[in-house]
From Swiss-Prot:
Pathway(s) of this molecule: Amino-acid biosynthesis; L-arginine biosynthesis; N(2)-acetyl-L-ornithine from L-glutamate: step 3/4
Subcellular location: Cytoplasm
GO cellular component, as recorded: cytoplasm
One GO term of the biological process aspect: L-arginine biosynthetic process
Record protein name field: N-acetyl-gamma-glutamyl-phosphate reductase
Family the entry assigns: Belongs to the NAGSA dehydrogenase family. Type 1 subfamily.
Keywords, alphabetical: Amino-acid biosynthesis, Arginine biosynthesis, Cytoplasm, NADP, Oxidoreductase
Annotated Gene3D superfamilies: Dihydrodipicolinate Reductase, domain 2 (3.30.360.10), NAD(P)-binding Rossmann-like Domain (3.40.50.720)
CDD domains: AGPR_1_C (cd23934), AGPR_1_N (cd17895)
Catalytic activity: N-acetyl-L-glutamate 5-semialdehyde + phosphate + NADP(+) = N-acetyl-L-glutamyl 5-phosphate + NADPH + H(+)
Known role: Catalyzes the NADPH-dependent reduction of N-acetyl-5-glutamyl phosphate to yield N-acetyl-L-glutamate 5-semialdehyde.
Principal location: cytoplasm
Active site: 148
């Protein structure tokens, strides 16, 4: 019996990415697709490359209950939570790719996203970063899929934080992301003429992913961590490269040894040998993350570099990895593809 899957928000970039990967997943049958903008039309007519002749509909909780074992919600922040609440008592698993289920402390969501999450404590949700919370994910029904920047930053810093090897509790992050991270916004800033041939910082210091990153770092480190974050938009479709600066007394060899051991058994996380630096092209279209490091012995500063595909490990691929865990499948099921060049 295949897993019956629904995708809410199927025509956005993360929804389409879910569709691209799930249609080739050997244990999945796609049974429900929703889209407010294209309700009543066939997915195949809107996006012929999808090769799925399913009628798109507006979100219908009764239809979801009747036709799905797991639902991916690829919706704007603030919309998913009401759906999760309405399905809370059903024998259904929900993986939210938005921000609504990411926070342990709902007051952070309220402060940064401007909405109160009523009865949040009744939703037994788990932060869906498998490399750190695998056992918790397996026992849950509600998964808050991490943001793209948090995934790239947390995986790159977790070994140091977990071992309490950070000095001074401060981390500086410079991240560069492809334009698909902004979704399908019809704004001048994301138009071809504005993006092409240009590099632009945005939401410096006050990006909405900062509280998510800091909350998770505190959970891993068992102490407050301050993140100074400067994201940049680069003229490419997909991919994130994060360069992270932090103080640690580990030597270069100790740093490499720590990371190699920490991620030794992880299929999707690759620790590169010294002096090898990753390219976003390596992770393009795949669920793989590449991490490299360099130690500045003069200043006791470690420079960590991570790359991933913001639409895959930063969103839809990680969501499928979480689904595989929930249903006791191999984590790489349906996720073994890569694209190069």
């Amino acid at each position: 019996m295949k897993i019956r899957v629904g995708i809410l928000g199927a025509t956005g970039y993360t929804g389409l990415e879910l569709l691209r990967m799930l249609k080739n997943h050997p244990q999945v049958k796609i049974t429900y697709l929703s889209s407010n903008n294209f309700s009543g039309q066939s997915m195949k007519d809107i996006y012929p490359f999808a090769e799925i002749d399913i009628l798109l509909s507006k979100i219908d909780v009764k239809e979801i209950k009747a036709n799905c074992d797991v639902v991916f919600t690829a919706l704007p922040a603030g919309i998913s939570y009401d759906i999760v609440k309405s399905l809370r008592d059903e024998n259904l698993k929900i993986i939210d790719l938005g921000a609504d289920l990411r926070f342990d402390d709902p007051s952070l969501y309220e402060k940064w996203y401007g909405r109160t999450l009523q009865d949040y404590g009744l939703i037994k949700r788990v932060y869906g970063l498998p490399e750190l919370y695998r056992s918790e994910i397996k026992e849950s029904r509600f998964i808050g899929n991490p943001g793209c920047y948090p995934t790239s930053i947390l995986l790159a810093t977790a070994p140091i934080l977990k071992r309490k090897l950070l000095v001074n509790g401060e981390i500086i992050v410079d991240s560069k992301s492809g334009v698909s991270g902004a979704g399908k916004k019809e704004e001048l800033a994301y138009s071809f003429c504005e993006i092409d041939g240009s590099l632009k910082p945005y939401s410096v210091i006050n990006h909405k992913h900062v509280p998510e990153i800091q909350e998770q770092m505190k959970k891993i480190y068992h102490s407050e961590v301050t993140v100074i974050f400067a994201p940049h938009l680069v003229p490419m479709v997909r991919g994130i490269l994060s360069t992270i600066y932090l103080k640690t007394r580990l030597s270069a060899d100790e740093l490499y040894g720590l990371y190699s051991e920490f991620y030794r058994d992880e299929y999707f996380v690759h620790v590169l040998k010294p002096a090898i630096y990753p390219s976003t092209k390596w992770s393009y279209g795949s669920n793989h993350v590449f991490i490299s490091m360099k130690k500045d012995e003069r200043t006791d500063t470690a420079v960590l570099i991570s790359v991933l595909d913001n639409l895959v490990k930063g969103a839809s691929g990680q969501a499928i990895q979480n689904m595989n865990i929930l249903f006791s499948l191999r984590e790489d099921t349906g996720l073994t593809f890569t694209v190069y060049p």
